Regions:
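Charged, gly/pro-rich active-site loop segments
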Residues: 1-8, 81-159
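Short, basic/aromatic recognition patches
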Residues: 1-25
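Helix-adjacent hinge/juxtasegments
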Residues: 63-86, 93
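Conserved hydrophobic/aromatic beta-strand scaffold that supports enzyme active sites
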Residues: 17, 25, 38, 143-145, ...
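Short beta-strand segments
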Residues: 21-60, 76
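A generic structural signal for nonpolar/aromatic side chains embedded in well-ordered alpha-helices
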Residues: 18, 67-68, 121
Length: 159
């Protein structure tokens, strides 16, 4: 990381940034395009003793699922806390932010695991109350677990 003064190296602080974000972009290898296929997804984070998992959901068909079946290695990025900062005296501006990026392996979850993944995802958006969802909706949803293998974070704060 070029700007070491903005690096967030503490895992707990990195996970707090993840919890403040409301969407996650996933880059999937697309060999037909010689470029990544990028999608923005809702997510939930589970911090376990030996690993961290991002849970995401999707329709049960489509380009994303086809590509993940070919190569489950993905990169991810999320950011939050965006605030334009304008310095009138210097007539310059910058942006405050927090961001996390990394890579890992996506795995399609079994039906039982998928229900847990959906619970974690719902807890991310509704942390103080359980929001039930119809079993039919859960049955028609593909749920993936992204095991994070590497993650970095940075932020620019108000001075």
């Amino acid at each position: 990381m070029r700007r070491k003064d903005r690096e967030v190296s503490d895992l707990r602080q990195q996970l707090e940034i993840v919890r403040r974000c409301d969407s996650c972009c996933i880059a999937i290898n697309d060999p037909d395009q010689d470029a990544p296929y990028i999608v923005e997804l809702s997510f939930g984070l589970e911090h376990l003793e030996d690993k961290d998992i991002l849970y995401v959901h999707s329709a049960k068909e489509g380009r994303k699922l086809e590509l993940l079946a070919q190569d489950p290695h993905v990169s991810f990025f999320m950011s939050c806390g965006h605030e334009l900062v304008y310095d009138a005296e210097r007539q310059m501006c910058t942006m405050n932010y927090e961001s996390v990026s990394g890579y890992g392996i996506m795995r399609l979850l079994s039906a039982q695991e998928a229900l847990h993944g959906l619970d974690v995802l719902m807890d991310h958006y509704y942390p103080h109350e359980r929001r039930p969802y119809h079993k039919k909706a859960a049955d028609s949803t593909a749920v993936y677990g992204l095991e994070i293998l590497s993650m970095t974070a940075k932020k620019r704060e108000k001075k």
